[in-house]
Amino acid sequence: MTTVRRLRPGDAPSYRALMLDAYARHPDAFTSSPTERSALPLSWWQARLAVEPLAKEIVFGAYTGEGVLCGATGLSFETREKARHKAQLFGMVVLASHRAHGVGAALVQAALAEARSRPDLRLVQLTVTQGNVSAQRLYERFGFVPFGIEPMAVAVGEGYVAKVHMWCDLRAT
């Protein structure tokens, strides 16, 4: 059984390890690289998980019955006056050994529940690597629809990958 909860500063070591592994294994899925993120001190990761009333980011973690962090995703909230109605889903990762078991769905569901609990939010946006059909289908199940493709969005090695931009209207049922 998987449990999803908001991560806190004390979860920073396991969250950092999960994300660094994801950056290394799936360089096309993330804009950050393992080199740049591994150089950040643990305090940076703890700050990302800070629990504050007006936090600019919230990160959710999925835990196995044994207490192992097997997935994570985050919501980033716009602070600029004209864009406060938007949030960004970011950093979605599920360990390969836990995929196709509902972990990703539970994480997206938790993030959208948090977004819907905020009366000023109207939409959530995300990007997914073009060609990652399983991830795109997961997001579509929760009401996300594509609205554009960003060519050459992320440099990977000598090449580039495109990102599909998607959005979810929180006003829809």
Task: Go through each PLM region and give its residues.
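Extreme N-terminal starter segment of soluble prokaryotic enzymes
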Residues: 1-4
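Acetyl-CoA-dependent GNAT
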Residues: 9-10, 16-17, 22-91, 95-97, ...
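Residues that form or flank phosphate/diphosphate-binding pockets in enzymes
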Residues: 14, 84, 102, 134
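Hydrophobic packing within well-folded, soluble alpha/beta domains
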Residues: 73, 94, 103-111, 124, ...
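Active-site acidic-Proline motif in GNAT/NAT acetyltransferases
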Residues: 95-97, 101, 130-131
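Short coil/turn segments at alpha/beta junctions that flank glycine-rich nucleotide-binding fingerprints
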Residues: 101, 117-122
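C-terminal "cap" of GNAT-fold acetyltransferases
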Residues: 120-173
